[in-house]
């Protein structure tokens, strides 16, 4: 399976004078001014009371293009649970004045609670540190800048327009009407962008939207080109050869492990034999000592760690009764004598962990002589906003998933470089080794939910499940994640679970819904081979490698004991020509992972 059924949307290339863009699934993407990306995306979102994005179904599509410009119109219908919202979109491009105008005009067809309905504008993350001008709703302007470091909270409030200059001297202004907008640093969630969104978060949410409520917003992108700007002949370079350059910089291969099955499913002898070949450095157990089955789950995880020759990373979720819970855990540890790797201390259901709780845990657990870390069970956002007192920590930790805001293949790939940025940022403000644990393709839990999600209807996959788990795309994405996290200096990374829909292989019993998740009983998924191939170089080094087109293909170079392994990943549903000067030249098939072994000359 190439992409788990997640096909790339049809893409329409449009031009409005010096501005070029693509229309995909009703959104404007890769808006360039004179061939240089100025705005990554403009799209409209309907998000319910739990921040779940309600997808839209597009109908009544109409496209007109000429030398004078473009007009693209459609209707988008969003229905899920209580939510029923319909809006009409219109994208108008004018070649005469280099403008793209996006109109959102919608009506609620039901009463529902929502956290956001309307436009979001994404500026690319690589303009971090660049100056900009903010026009506020009262007409006042402010000279500002996109933050270089990942900013915990919003850099810009009360926004009507943002103007910045691209590398080729184009002055690009994005004007937003119909609501008050503000900007957040989406790198917190590994999105490679700064998002300017409608409806300030300081206002109470969720808000009730009554049937019949109309919402209209307009976003206009305009560009003033320098007099000597060259004419645009192409809006991208999709067919160019990707050149990868091996640098002299090196980092250690991180210790890569897996999570035990969250549903408590055991592993069979045959599954254990297969998993042992992956050589996981650790197994992560999320242990809630107050839960009735905590003792049994601890014993099971200890047994699995021994069976796989792995260490046990115990993530303790402690409540206000932490003294009693730590006492029980200490007793169970003496009883089980597991191959401990480390302790990870969390305050249960909290975005951060108080230093006093970490110190209390260290006092009880230090007798077992393994590292004690903390941070957050949530995203880097929570770590950044609730920065721990790292003086009593051996490492800091946070989790990653690429689908907090967007769900298409291209957006998932865009998160990969930003994953590395979060590691560098966490290391900078804590001064401690960084453990990224776990990395999953989809959300495990929502730290910002205002209520529980409804149960999964019969015959449907749970929200946490993504069919790209068993796809070639999933393998390529996993290699990209390892590359960027490792090259940024992550000391350890936890990926996925052992078996099943969220694991690295299917269970012997097979998929409970084979029509929706078409795996083969007992078979490893393609991402299994990626993890195994990297772990075969455990204790070695990684030579940092740069790609000329990191959203199309990247590579990872591993070395140990005179041996070298080059692993290449193709992120797109097309063939990609790759050249590594002095090493190899090849063509990658769609979503392929290619491995080449040789001798190290370093």
Please report, for each region that a protein language model flagged, where it lies by residue:
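Acidic-aromatic substrate-binding/catalytic surfaces of carbohydrate-active enzymes
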Residues: 1-77, 280, 284, 295
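Beta-strand-rich recognition/accessory modules
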Residues: 43, 77-81, 163-241
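Extended, loop-rich substrate-binding clefts of extracytoplasmic carbohydrate-active enzymes
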Residues: 48-106, 184-186, 190-193
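Polysaccharide-binding surfaces and accessory modules of carbohydrate-active proteins
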Residues: 99-177
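Aromatic/acidic polysaccharide-binding cleft in carbohydrate-active enzymes
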Residues: 212, 437-526
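Catalytic domains of carbohydrate-active enzymes, especially glycoside hydrolases
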Residues: 259-292, 304-313, 336
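Noncatalytic carbohydrate-binding groove/subsite architecture in carbohydrate-active enzymes
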Residues: 349-472
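Carbohydrate-binding surface patches
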Residues: 547-581
